[in-house]
Amino acid sequence: MAIAYFIPDQAQLLARSYQQNGQQTAASPRTTATAAAPSQQQQQSQQQQQQQRHHHQQQRPQFRANISVPLGSQQGSMTMSEFGCWDLLAQIFCYALRIYSYSSSQRQPTVIQISFEISSGGQNNDEDDVTDATSKEN
């Protein structure tokens, strides 16, 4: 039986922490000196532009979910509905949509990329691998 580990609460907390950091940066007061020299005003405007660029970069939360699906020797006899991989992909996609459409006022075009990797768990598990087609000779 295949088991999938997916922790959506951590993903939601991650997205919210990025959003809260962005709101705190926007809410911080900026003071400017009225009697400052022109060179100081230019430096302050450059610093504000850099802060705005940095703030704009922080508004894009990036989220990565690592999902581990250990497959045993019984996986070959399981049907696709028993394995449930389509259900898992649908849950990941729907949850990603919820995270990125959290604030409808700042909604931007979003590309959601779901990728997966199939690899063996270890190098010494070749004897248990039912898909290994090579013959082993002593």
UniProtKB/Swiss-Prot annotation:
Ranges of Low complexity composition bias in the record: 23-51
Cellular component GO terms, alphabetically? Answer: cytoplasm; mitochondrial matrix; mitochondrion; nucleus; plasma membrane
Region annotation Disordered: where it falls in the sequence: 21-71, 119-138
> Which spans of this chain does the record mark as coiled coil?
none
Keywords for this protein = Apoptosis
Q: Name one GO biological process term.
A: determination of adult lifespan
Recorded GO molecular functions are: protein homodimerization activity
Do the record's keywords include GTP-binding? no
Q: How does it assemble?
A: Interacts with Diap2 (via BIR2 domain).
The function of this protein is:
Activator of apoptosis, independent of rpr and hid, that acts on the effector Dredd.
Q: What is this protein called?
A: Cell death protein Grim
Q: Which gene encodes it?
A: grim
